């Protein structure tokens, strides 16, 4: 059977040919665990589950990695509001998320890395980006310099003005360019953080997936997946971080296919109002 997958990178359906016929490797961006999973999270998990099941009918070995983001501003805020240690909060909601996915008959990933277990790899990646001239440190922050990556916008197809308007990143005075984004930021007491060459701080969200996907799967791998809402800025920034370290800046140095599921339409103001764990078990 010929398997075709819509590749966001090219905007077309392409015949799927793995990097290595004997081992297909897939990375999916997983949840940020500060609350119950909502139906939007489930939508993405079900789409990934379908993809993995199809791949496993065609190839002998498929490794499926999906991360857990367990350090994030939303997590810090939730832990503060609940007066609960961050580790306890994220462990609890990771367990509930996995239980919810199992209830939906969604297979858990072969590898489920937690961001906080890979801070060393993130610091190493930042160091490489600084040494290559793609990142810079200012006022305790380390930022990726977007103009240094010649193919920025290759995934989202956004022009320069759209990139800045849609980045959802505050234009801070220490940025060299308005589109530059955070790789590392300081953590003032009592915020959580780690020691680094740039002071006590924590990683930016985009950096986490670049570091964890390379650590768990190696480069290049076959498919990077997520919801359409992650195309920009998250996945665009992942490509920039990873591929700027290669001389030709080719996105194929990272992942060959980018698989994105559509957003789920829901009548509530937010899909977060329909959390899976609040639904009756008989549903």
Regions found by a protein language model. Name each.
Residues 1-34, 49, 99, 120-268, ...:
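Alpha-helical recognition segments enriched in aromatics with Gly/Pro capping
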Residues 4, 61-63, 111:
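Conserved beta-strand segments of alpha/beta enzyme cores
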């Amino acid at each position: 059977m010929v398997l075709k997958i819509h590749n966001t990178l090219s905007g077309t359906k392409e015949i799927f040919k793995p990097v290595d016929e004997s081992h297909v490797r897939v990375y999916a961006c997983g949840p940020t665990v500060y609350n119950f999973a909502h139906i939007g999270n489930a939508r993405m998990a079900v789409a990934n589950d379908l993809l993995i099941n199809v791949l496993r009918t065609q190839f002998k070995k498929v490794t499926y990695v999906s991360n857990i983001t367990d350090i994030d501003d939303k997590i810090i805020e939730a832990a503060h509001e609940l007066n609960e240690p961050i580790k306890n909060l994220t462990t609890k909601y990771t367990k509930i998320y996995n239980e919810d996915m199992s209830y939906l008959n969604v297979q858990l990933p072969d590898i489920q890395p937690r961001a906080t277990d890979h801070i060393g790899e993130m610091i190493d990646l930042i160091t490489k980006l600084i040494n290559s001239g793609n990142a810079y440190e200012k006022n305790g922050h380390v930022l990726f310099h977007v103009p240094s990556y010649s193919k920025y916008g290759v995934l989202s197809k956004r022009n320069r003005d759209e990139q800045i308007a849609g980045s959802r990143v505050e234009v801070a005075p220490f940025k060299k360019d308005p589109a530059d984004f955070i790789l590392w930021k300081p953590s003032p007491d009592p915020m959580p953080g780690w020691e680094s060459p740039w002071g006590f701080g924590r990683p930016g969200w985009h950096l986490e997936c670049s570091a964890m996907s390379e650590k768990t799967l190696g480069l290049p791998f076959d498919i990077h997946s997520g919801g359409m809402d992650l195309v920009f800025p998250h996945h665009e920034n992942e490509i920039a971080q990873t591929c700027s370290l290669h001389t030709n800046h080719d996105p194929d140095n990272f992942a060959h296919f980018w698989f994105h599921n559509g957003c789920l339409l829901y009548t509530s103001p937010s899909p977060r109002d329909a959390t899976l764990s609040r639904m009756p078990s008989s549903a």
